[in-house]
Amino acid sequence: MATRIKILPENLTNKIAAGEVVERPASVVKELVENALDAGCSEVVVEIEAGGRRLIKVTDSGCGMTREDALLALERHATSKIASDSDLFGLATLGFRGEALPSIASVSRFALATREKGAIEGTEIYAEGGRVKEVKVCGMAEGTVISVRNLFFNTPARLKFMKSSDTEAGHVGDLLTKLAISRPDVRFIYNNDGRTIFRALDADLRERVATLLGRALSADLYPLDFHDGPLGVTGLIAKPECSRSAASHLYTYINGRFIKDKVVQHAVLQAYRNFMERGRYPVVVLFITVPADEVDVNVHPTKHEVRFREQGRVHDAIQAALESVLRATPWVRKQAAPQPFASPPPASEASATRVAEVRETLARYSPEKHLQQSFTVPPAATFQRQQGAVSLPVAAREDDTASDKTESKGYYCSLSVIGQFNAAYILCQDGTDLVIIDQHAAHERVAFEKLKAQFAAAQVESQRLLFPETIELSFKEGATLREHLAELGRLGFSLEEFGGATWLLNAVPRLLSGTDYLRTLRDILEELQTLGRSRTFADALEEILSRIACHSVVRGIHPLNGQEISALFAQMDATEFSSNCPHGRPVLRSLTLPEIERMFKR
């Protein structure tokens, strides 16, 4: 009786393997360039035609191969990078499976020319559809040249899934950008249809990033250097204003290998969570180093995912490393990153004179609709008060006297206050820059950081109500409240069941006194209802704290006097992450003198 299970022929198994390894032209480039880097090259030249369909050619200056090794390289699972199973847990190379070359050769017309260092001649091999057709001696420079023509010529079904030439060329460019950033010591050249797309000379990391991602972005990157024993996190991170709508600019590397790992991405987003609105992604170039035996890279065909032995430690180290830079908000405090190119010249004396003239004009301009009666603020003067009390965080009122006595000259305290616009924005001058501060966002950040510190110390200030208030809750809201009653108590709420669907509210967080705290409580319960089984109260804590902070501070039009502005600025200088509110919105924006002059065609 004939068997139904058959051993597949080698050419078919190679095509199946190619389906996992070779998804598109960029996949071919990835495997070939990684081999070149493993070979110790100092230069890689990548050329493609028709998006990689017609030709992919990779030339490197690596160690090259002998005739015997070149032939073995086209056999499945033949590699020089591992010899035993223990080597899988101490990998120091990008490639190791020995699948790439035979898989690529099985779906293309493949040519390999190589010459080992010190050899007097090279070897050239031609294969078609995985079968070696010709082997001969050749003359060439030391290194390796691989040409892949007519990709997927024998698998027409795969060709149907190929995109346009421009799209495929774009994928190749993105892939090469990732690889080139990982090795700034290696020259990378990328040519598409005879046109040079980029030429990245060997340089330091900042210069390499400037070449590939643009000098404007490079100017907004700040260095990172964090170590926790054998675990290290280094690289460059951008200020929040450079955020993107997708994760395309998360350049993350584990031991030099580009990865798209959920643990790493979550750590990055957690660090930036208070700086960006939801749905935005930062720009980071991170190099994470861990002992080779602490990470498994053999868990995905494309090696883009890894598995850490101590996942939590790696996550926390990445988050702590990023927060160590973000906490200082260097882009606000003028701690400019070193530039790989010349800075613009300083403003001329004439420009400075024009700034003074503009400021003098602004001081005289005071339409009642938008500004307070007096626009200029002498050090001891105050704005003319409008009718009604100003709602400020408690800390601001308590610290008024102290802030007058302090000699702190942080960034915010060093600003020269011009006035208040629409009783919602504080206008300041910083040298020749015009700085606009959203007073609500600033108060919100101060209140949030204070509340977070109080919660961590179990010392949230609570304000007991003179008369308890009743609140009617749905069955679902009531169940949520019972489940999280203790946590809400730590937040400063005191509630007890009154009967049926009615609850008594006896106390609220002190920050919320004088506000619509019932609405805030309902919003928190709604937030808790969306947690689900996969999340805990701790996961939603920062969202809840930011909601309380937002509801507790001044909103809309609220005039502030000079003492109140000084107190706010002193608090901002003492507050971490002060450039953004807890929801990620910016606290301040700056207009440089050249930008203002361009507005007026100067």
From Swiss-Prot:
Q: Which Pfam families match?
A: DNA_mis_repair (PF01119), HATPase_c (PF02518), MutL_C (PF08676)
Give me the Gene Ontology terms describing cellular component. Answer: mismatch repair complex
| BP terms from Gene Ontology | mismatch repair
Which keywords fit this entry according to its UniProt record? DNA damage, DNA repair
In the record, which residues are listed under signal peptide?
A: none
User: What biological function has been recorded for the protein in this entry?
Assistant: This protein is involved in the repair of mismatches in DNA. It is required for dam-dependent methyl-directed DNA mismatch repair. May act as a 'molecular matchmaker', a protein that promotes the formation of a stable complex between two or more DNA-binding proteins in an ATP-dependent manner without itself being part of a final effector complex.
Q: Which family does it belong to?
A: Belongs to the DNA mismatch repair MutL/HexB family.
The molecule here is called DNA mismatch repair protein MutL
Q: Which gene encodes it?
A: mutL
